[in-house]
Amino acid sequence: MKFKKISFLVSCVLLVSVSCSDYQKLLNSDDTSEKYKQAEVFYNNGEYRKANRLFEQIVPKYRGKPQAQRIIFFFADSYFQSKSYSLAAYQYENFVKSYPKSDRIQEATFKAAKSYYFQSPTYSLDQEETYEAIEKLQIFINLYPSSEYAAEANQMIAELQEKLEKKDFEIAKQYYTIRDYKSAIKANDNFVAGFPGTKLREEALYVKFLALYEIATNSVLSKKEARLKELQQQYALILRYYPETLFMEDLNGKMEKVNKELEQFNTTTTLSK
């Protein structure tokens, strides 16, 4: 039994070696027609990297010929399927420019835009590629609003917008973390104004409340009452939009202290009359 297993493994290794050897011979061959045939076989079998190398070799040979359109599309798509998105975007765009009347024009335009989408980095990094991806996807939607890919394109734009929102919000929140409370207030105001429909609006209003709280409770006496009242207004604003806010416990705890301080101001004012 053990001998059979070893024999089977040896056979597999030899088969792979022969296969690799045949593929290398094909790469070194001058038989363009056979390369084209095998490139499509590899592509259809999901061996996109192997297909890609063959397509790359034969693209110049078929340029200007009837097969060129098909080959260039599959060349681009083999990059896409191999997750080489930068090269895929370039080749799809090359296809779109070369064959504007192709039956595959929508698919190529969409996949070019989708390639930019896949290149968008995590929110903590520079978002230049995210903006570019949104632009490409929006251009696609404008060109083909009824396309079968339009819904997916809109969904990708929404995801990228959320990434930009998170980026801006984390910057706004960072001001609070480093105790630059005035900048935190301004940044969160700008964030809410810039992204009125954001899912992070509740938290942004809360972070602004926290910044106002730190300023108000540490103010000199001459400015304290006005700032505590501003804090009351921010608290009321949060409850108006989010009556069951996730931050209720902390908000109520802080407002108890605020209200007690305001009562002291009211008592002092009454006694002075």
Feature names for model-found ranges:
Residues 10-17:
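Bacterial N-terminal signal peptides
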